[in-house]
């Protein structure tokens, strides 16, 4: 009888059933289930190899090697899982030590990686510590050695590593579908609202609950159209109530209309308080976006204007009001509705009034040039941004990635993204030069690394159960989302996108020929075209909806500089500042006009259809006509446009002014300052401190044309 010598020196009889137990555990960790035939093969392989050794005693190390050999022939993914788990005690000690060190920093210093989080709060600290553990687990059990090395060196960056194992990224959530006919949430049945005020309450609950089950931006598209039927119900109920009190029909309609307007204002105010003060189970304030602007009905118009007016007036004590950050507002601009003399020009004017005082709404062109407008012009379909800048590729109702026929139409609402991985282009270029290799050859290597990560992510998430996010997968929030709680979500993932991010195109151009994007940009354009061509081939070969994403580098803008310096040192205009440029944006220090910036960045616009935003810093003090002119110009060019001002509010006397560091009225430095982080706004100063990291603060300090 053959005996196995264990690590502690004890011996026990060889039992192939113990091999079955071990490989099944490894398969479970890899989300794989072996068939009986596969298990029989493994058992026969191991038994045969052990007998061929012609030994009475076999070390556990030799046994592991034999089992690995069997698994490599059966399922390499499980073989990796088995191999990774072998030395788990040593690895886990090291991993937990890293988590402990980071946890001490979080507990006593804080963390500014994500400006949506207030790391002073206990709930946030706990969440951040859990995130550190989750990052380590992701690297240990999901990533290959090559991927880990590429990340540590800085050639690629896996966004939201702490959450990718569990759920999806950003989405266009179908609130309307969830509300229709009622739904279940938290084991309670919610009837469909019968009045506008109840609709606001329920929508707030849906958004906070569903947004907590994902990690990216959560967009409610066309909020005015969602609220419109509930406003109509409130209006009719109001007329009936007032007529019952003896008022004439005309007077009853007048009073009912006033009530609906008040409900809109109170409802949007309630959402603003809820979304900016109630943190999610993730420890952050969910990044919620609401889009509006195309509704032409009386209550749709009222909804949009009320939303904008509530934001413009701000929240807080009388005399100390300031705009909130969430939800981010996006105005859906149609020149045939919002142009001079058109049906919704008054809605457009309300948007301009709001933007010039609060920076929001951002503006999305539906009738200009390019991909987003083409979907609206041809199909009447709006592609609202997911979160701050992500956009979906078309998914057709019948044909999927391609239209089945001329009548087939794309679907956007109810879809989502499964994650982004970004290329650090200056580092990849520097590596190619240092090693004497063709740039495209080195770039291809990292593109394929990202491709493989995405493929495994689709496979991994596909094994998740619908119960992990019931509002999305069971109650209709996502396309195809009427699954049973025990169903796997794999069918829903077909229409999901996965993003290849790009950062620091300006620094890439500088590294190539010592010129900025404002001075040249041709090499950066050529590189971005090449990436698009490669990713398009990946889409055809893999059948996955890959997208090119202009990365909003928040914490990453500083991390990439450190990574570059470690490998290639300090290079002028590449790594000599504390930050790199976001995506295809001109460097923030460029002394260019808003119009010049629009034109320079417009060259890259249609090459980043998976995520993009254009914004300019307005060197003007609440100048309505100037803002209107630049917004209309951006809309003609087909942009998704942000208005950049540097808002500042004195928390002591209530004075507000642009670009203020010390209050000129009372001399206080106790200010709240709001700046654009990337595609969204954030507090660059709250009660003397900031939620932003040092690199981003350094960038903000140098902004001229951002």
Per-region residue spans from a language model:
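Amphipathic, well-packed alpha-helical segments that form the structural scaffold of globular domains
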Residues: 24, 47, 451, 455, ...
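Solvent-exposed, amphipathic alpha-helical segments
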Residues: 45, 49-52, 426-432, 511
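Conserved catalytic cores of very large enzyme subunits
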Residues: 99-494, 515-517, 521-676, 682, ...
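Charged, amphipathic alpha-helical regulatory modules used
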Residues: 1-106, 696-701, 706
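A structural signal for well-ordered alpha-helices, especially hydrophobic packing surfaces
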Residues: 75, 93, 279, 454, ...
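Short, conserved micro-motifs enriched in small and acidic residues
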Residues: 13-14, 495-499
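Contiguous, well-ordered alpha-helical segments that form the cores/surfaces of helical PPI scaffolds
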Residues: 225, 498-511, 529
